[in-house]
Curated annotation (Swiss-Prot):
It is found in: Virion. The keyword Cell cycle does not apply. One of its GO terms (biological process) is DNA-templated transcription. Induction: Expressed in the early phase of the viral replicative cycle. GO terms for molecular function: DNA binding; DNA-directed RNA polymerase activity. Its EC number is 2.7.7.6. This is DNA-directed RNA polymerase 7 kDa subunit. InterPro entries: RNA_pol_7kDa_chordopoxvir (IPR008448).
Length: 63
């Protein structure tokens, strides 16, 4: 599952590019060939999060 990613500058949905990076394991250089806006290219290059660890840890009881 890939969380939606929208460019905050131009409003373009770049979830498909993020899917290609995280799930399909396509190189960043290859994915950026199809992205024209510099703002979207920058966001994809710098703000891609690693896959999240969804394990739940118990809360600590401080009392």
């Amino acid at each position: 599952m890939v969380f939606q990613l929208v460019c905050s500058t131009c409003g373009r949905d770049i979830s498909e590019e993020r899917y290609a990076l995280l799930i399909k394991k396509i190189d960043l250089k290859t994915v950026l060939r199809g992205v024209k806006n510099n703002c979207c290219r920058l966001k994809l290059s710098t703000q891609i999060e690693p896959q999240r660890n969804l394990t739940v840890e118990p809360l600590l009881d401080i009392n």
